[in-house]
Amino acid sequence: MTESVKNINMIDAVKLFFKNYFNFTGRASRSEYWWFILSYFIVSIVIGTIEFIFTFATVFADIYNDPYSTPNALKYWYLMPSYLFTYAMMIGLLSLAARRLQDRGHTGWWQLANIIPGILFLIPYLSIFDSIVTGGSFNPGAAIAATIFGIIGFGTGVTMIVFLCLPPQEDENKWGRNPLLPDTRMTDQISDELL
C-alpha cells in the first residue's frame, strides 16, 4: 500500500517519491504529485544552469584556444549529470504518475497514450533531421507523419495534464483508499475493542 499523509509538503513528497519508487499500485494525492514535480523541476533548472555555464565556457575556450586540445568525448563531460538525473528519475516518475492517475480512477496505463505518440513523432523527426544534416533529400511523408504524431502527442499531453490536475475519487476505488482521508484503522480497532 502506498504511504501518504494528509498535509503533505515538498519534503514529504520527495520522501514518498523515493519510498514508493517502484510502487505502481495504490494512489498518490495531487499534492504528493505536484510537490514532487516542482522539486524535480527546480533540480532540473539548477543542473541545466550549471551545464549552460560549462557549455558557454567550453565554446568560449574553443573560440580563443586550440579546439583540438581536448578530445570531443571528454570536452562535454558536464552534460552527463542531466542525462543521469533524468534516467535515474524515470521509473519513479512513471510510478508516481500511475498512482496519481489511479487516485483519479484511471489506470496507470493511460501514460502510454502520451508516450507512444511521442516515440512515433521522434522516429520521422529524426529521419528529417538526418536528411538535413547529411544533405539528403527531403521526405514529405516523414514530415506529415511527424506532424500527425506531434498533434496527437499534444492532445494526449493536454489530456494527461487535465487528468493529473483533477481532484481524486472520494473514499475508495479499486486502487485503494483516498490518501487524503484520515486513517480510520486505529479508530475501527478501538471501537471493536470497546464492543
Locate each region found by the language model:
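Membrane-helix interface segments in multi-pass membrane proteins
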Residues: 44-86, 117-156
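Central hydrophobic cores of alpha-helical transmembrane segments
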Residues: 109-119
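Membrane-interface extramembranous regions at the lipid-water interface
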Residues: 1-40, 93-109, 161-195
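Selective recognition of hydrophobic, aromatic-rich stretches within alpha-helical transmembrane segments
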Residues: 4-12, 69-95, 104, 109-110, ...
